Curated annotation (Swiss-Prot):
GO terms for cellular component: cytosol. It comes from Thioalkalivibrio sulfidiphilus (strain HL-EbGR7). This is Shikimate dehydrogenase (NADP(+)). Its EC number is 1.1.1.25. It catalyses: shikimate + NADP(+) = 3-dehydroshikimate + NADPH + H(+). NADP(+) binds at residues 77, 127-131, 151-156, 215, 239. Pfam families: SDH_C (PF18317), Shikimate_DH (PF01488), Shikimate_dh_N (PF08501). The keyword NAD does not apply.
Length: 273
């Protein structure tokens, strides 16, 4: 039986073991998948130990995606562009291939599951950290009219925009740069929503048919999605679908078969009162 794991700090909250168990059952794959806690200064040692124990691949979560990028012996184009790795595959010669499936997971959830149009639309993304960097290239590949990155520290958003300027019409700025803008699609890539707080956003930020997507997820609507509902969002979604879709990309890389994600999302989706 092949063994896989998700590595993080913390890791107890992870839904990945259940997701991959459902994928394995659905596709008839003989594999085990577990959550592994790594010390903040012990990611590389943890990976090496697990590889020595015969593990075939890993998902990587906060805060180790940058370290995984450095540890990988080879990188896919998506990982290189994102500057971060959330999936490692142990190749036949024992070397590590680094991949980033976050952006593909977001785009698949938005376009295929939710039916959101991106081409020719105005996008606003909140945040300028690793989570946002990982999704910019796949979003720009869909041909939005504009993509504006807004962050509390405007310089970080501006630098991120410069890094991706060759891929499409992307700009960056601080939260004040949102004044006068209207978004067809507003994406929260910060963790603020988990802390029951939302960055100060203009009341008229959403276009009349604009919707909101939170890359975070929880058993109840995040603070960001509550803001969205209060400000007339035409649709809202949290990041559960993105989580399942990026997991399916990882699973396909490891096992050579792509699972069906819809049934898994339905199983994991909590019933709202």
């Amino acid at each position: 039986m092949d063994k896989y794991a998700v590595i993080g700090h913390p890791i107890g909250h992870s839904k990945s073991p259940r997701i991959h168990a459902l994928f394995a059952g659905q596709t008839g794959q003989d594999m085990a998948y577990e959550a592994v806690f790594a010390p903040l200064d012990g990611f590389a040692d943890t990976v090496r130990r697990l590889v020595a124990e015969g593990y075939r691949g890993f998902n990587v979560t906060v805060p180790f995606k940058g370290e995984a990028f450095k540890l990988a012996d080879a990188l896919t184009d998506r990982a290189r562009c994102a500057g971060a790795v959330n999936t490692l595959k142990v190749q036949d010669d024992g070397t590590l291939l680094g991949e980033n499936t976050d952006g593909a997971g977001l785009v698949t959830d938005l376009v295929n599951n939710l039916g959101v149009a991106i081409a020719g639309r105005d996008l606003v993304v909140l945040g300028a950290g690793g989570a946002v960097r990982g999704v910019l290239a796949p979003l720009l590949a869909l041909g939005p009219a504009s993509l504006h990155i807004a962050n509390r520290t405007g310089a970080r958003a501006e630098q991120l925009a410069r890094d991706f300027a060759d891929l499409g019409p992307v700009t960056g700025g601080d939260l004040d740069s949102l004044m006068g803008r209207q978004a067809h699609v507003l994406i929260n890539g910060t963790s603020a929503g988990l802390d029951d707080e939302v960055p100060p956003l203009p009341d008229d930020l959403l276009h009349a048919d604009g919707g909101c997507y939170d890359m975070m997820y929880g058993d109840r609507p995040t603070a960001f999605l509550r803001w969205a509902a209060a400000h007339g969002a035409a649709w809202t979604a949290d990041g559960l679908g993105m989580l399942v879709e990026q997991a399916a990309e990882s699973f396909a890389l490891w096992r050579g078969v792509r699972p069906q994600t819809g049934p898994v999302i339905q199983i994991l989706r909590p019933v709202q009162p």
